Swiss-Prot record:
The lineage of its organism: Bacteria, Pseudomonadati, Pseudomonadota, Betaproteobacteria, Rhodocyclales. Phosphorylated by CheA. Phosphorylation of the N-terminal regulatory domain activates the methylesterase activity. SUPFAM superfamilies: CheY-like, Methylesterase CheB, C-terminal domain. It is an enzyme of class 3 (hydrolase). It comes from Dechloromonas aromatica (strain RCB). This is Protein-glutamate methylesterase/protein-glutamine glutaminase 1. Pfam families: CheB_methylest, Response_reg. GO terms for biological process: chemotaxis. Involved in chemotaxis. Part of a chemotaxis signal transduction system that modulates chemotaxis in response to various stimuli. Catalyzes the demethylation of specific methylglutamate residues introduced into the chemoreceptors (methyl-accepting chemotaxis proteins or MCP) by CheR. Also mediates the irreversible deamidation of specific glutamine residues to glutamic acid. One of its GO terms (cellular component) is cytoplasm. Belongs to the CheB family. Keywords: Chemotaxis, Cytoplasm, Hydrolase, Phosphoprotein. The modification 4-aspartylphosphate is found at D57. The active site is at S171, H197, D293.
Length: 350
């Protein structure tokens, strides 16, 4: 009989603990071994129960989820999926949790009929499976992130005038991977369009966080913006992001069409538009993530003459999307996350 994934649910709400536990226990390969109402109880249960994965409420009494997560990752690192409210404060806190080492997050189930219980349970279970299989990432130390920007990312690199456009896709582990990649990108970079699988309530906070850390201007795409050098456009969580041709260059386009590969925004939608309209002037980058979204789109980009890059297995939190792309021949060059910015900038200047 296969060994089940042992999950500890940590949430101050008895109702939420019961609901999450019920959803997880329905999965044939999982079992909830305990449910803790606060950080102190969770700490004791971890010692006794030795769970494989933790689901952790962002906001709890006594010691909040962030403080507990920071201590956990320092003293007893383990895979954690954060459970967050769909608020601006909740999204900012969740992004901080990912920086501290949480593998992924999911919003709390809502009673407004936004999605079915079955759909939510399926996503929760998938994220727990991915978390168990994921590589734990060391949280960043207190060093200045701007100081980590390499010399090649000087304000006057000249790369923005290359006529190239960079397209990036990521999922699980992607918030930190995208940040690390963009820390190596200069202020006058070519335009960059990014799809990160993320709910609507979180993408604006994600873009603001990146903008505060990285040299280029980084915004959440609104649609119909001129695609300009020195600007990075992050897909909003409610729509697909595409590129389209305008009278004087390229524009962003948002499409609230059905999900593709069960995602909206989907990486394949962005990459397909790049292959069709930008062709040899495009550069495609696929980073860490669960599933196969982006693989076919990256292949079409390569077939259209674009340079294509995939994150290697050793540096991925989840080697899913880059693996699928590599297996079908979509990836021209595989490299570590540490090398990605340098390799991509080399392709821009080639």
């Amino acid at each position: 009989m296969p060994i089940k994934t042992r999950v500890l649910v940590v949430d101050d709400s008895a109702l939420m603990r019961g609901l999450l536990s019920q959803m997880i226990n329905l999965a044939p390969d999982m079992e909830v071994v305990g449910a803790a109402p606060d950080a102190q109880s969770a700490r004791e249960m971890i010692k006794v129960l030795n769970p494989d994965v933790l689901t952790l409420d962002v906001q709890m009494p006594k010691m909040d989820g962030l403080e507990f997560l920071e201590r956990l990752m320092r003293l007893r690192p383990m895979p954690v999926v954060m459970v967050s409210s769909f608020t601006e404060a909740g999204s900012d806190t969740t992004l901080k949790a990912l920086e501290l080492g949480a593998i992924d997050f999911i919003g709390k189930p809502r009673a407004d009929g936004g999605r079915s219980v079955e759909n939510y349970a399926e996503e929760l279970v998938e994220k727990i499976r991915a978390a168990k299989a994921a590589r734990l990432r060391r949280a960043m130390t207190g060093n200045s992130v701007r100081a980590a920007t390499p010399a090649s990312a000087s304000p006057k690199s000249g790369l923005g005038a290359s006529g190239k456009i960079i397209f990036v896709g990521a999922s699980t582990g992607g918030t930190e991977a995208i940040k690390d990649f963009l820390l190596g990108i200069p202020a006058d970079c070519p335009p960059i369009l990014i799809v990160q699988h993320m709910p609507e309530a979180f993408t604006a906070s994600f873009a603001r966080r990146l903008d505060s850390l990285c040299a280029p201007r980084i915004i959440e795409a609104k649609g119909n913006e001129k695609v300009e050098p020195g600007t990075i456009y992050v897909a909003p969580g409610h729509s697909h992001l595409l590129i389209r041709r305008g009278t004087a260059g390229f524009l962003t386009e948002l499409a609230a069409t059905p999900p593709v590969n069960r995602h909206r925004p989907a990486v394949d939608v962005l990459f397909d538009s790049a292959a069709t309209l930008v062709g040899r002037k495009a550069i495609g980058v696929i980073l860490t993530g669960m599933g196969k979204d982006g693989a076919q789109g990256l292949l079409r980009m390569r077939q259209a003459g674009a340079r294509t890059f995939g994150q290697d297995e050793s540096s991925c939190v989840v080697y899913g999307m880059p693996r699928e792309a590599f297996l079908i021949g979509a990836v021209e060059e595989q490299c570590s996350l540490d090398e990605m910015a340098r390799r991509v900038l080399g392709a821009v200047s080639a």
